[in-house]
Structures are given as C-alpha cells and as structure tokens.
Amino acid sequence: TETFEEVAHEYMEGYIQQVPNCRLQEGAVEILRTLSEAGYSHSLLSAYHQQRLEEAVDYFGLRKWFIRLIGLNDYYAHSKVENGIKWIRELPFPRQEVVFVGDMLHDYEVARAMGVDCILLTCGHQSRNQLERCGVLVLDSLSEAADRLLN
C-alpha cells in the first residue's frame, strides 16, 4: 500500500511532465504587460512546489513580469495560507492595494487570510456556482479581471 506522501509525489511528477503540453490563458503575456505598464506589480502564490513553479514560469518566459514567485516546499499544499500571510507582511504597500486573483475556493480562503480583495476566475476546476458562494467578484477570464482592474 502506498502512503499519501508517495501518491502525492507520484501525482505531482506526472503533473510536472505535462507542463510542456499546457497553454497560457489567451492574452496572458499581453495582460501582464498592460497591467505592469499601468503600475501594477505581480506576485505568483502557488501550491506548486517552489522549484517546479520557477521552472514552469521560466518555461513560459514569464519571470520578468513577477516581483516574487512563492511556491511550497512540499506537495501537500499545507502552507499556501501561511506563505500568503508572510508575503503580505513583506510587501512594501498596504494590503488595501492588493487583489488576489485565483480560480479555486482555496484561493478565496488564502485571500481572506491575507486580508486582501479577491477575484475568482471560472477557468479552474470549480464551477461558477461554487465560486459565487464566496461572495466575491467571479469572472470568466483573466482579460475580464484585467479590464476590471484597469477601469
């Protein structure tokens, strides 16, 4: 019988192998560029393993758009909330100026723990109905989120 740790590691190794087959959301690079030019900075907080997160970001050529990449040191997603709280304390601007954009209920939980606004996107694996129960703005795409931030 496999342990949870073995199953988690096996799952993530399979997931990692699929990164080259993944695509960015339509217009993602242009959206990052436009928001950066408008004065927004970007951080990436993920339940992905830190080293793998950096490799994936580099694979897609996105590192220049982020002031910080924050992943986990294991595969169990136990400390995404803790990492978010730590990061918000380190940011050089007030949390009222931070918007957490995510696509999962857990992203809402992290944003709430950080004390920041949250926008949830329906492009993940949770339904609009599930996301709307959080009581925050729910949009269908990254471009819609960018439009809201810019207008």
Model-derived regions, located:
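Short beta->alpha linker loops
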Residues: 23-27, 48, 75, 103, ...
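Phosphate- and divalent-cation-binding pockets in alpha/beta enzyme and binding domains
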Residues: 27, 52-55, 110, 130, ...
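Acidic, Mg2+-coordinating phosphoryl-transfer loop and its flanking beta/alpha structural elements
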Residues: 99-139
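A short, structured active-site edge motif that brings together acidic residues
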Residues: 63-78
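Short, acidic loop-to-helix structural element flanking the phosphoryl-transfer center
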Residues: 13-44, 50-57, 81
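Short amphipathic alpha-helix with an adjacent loop that forms part of the alpha/beta core around
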Residues: 145-151
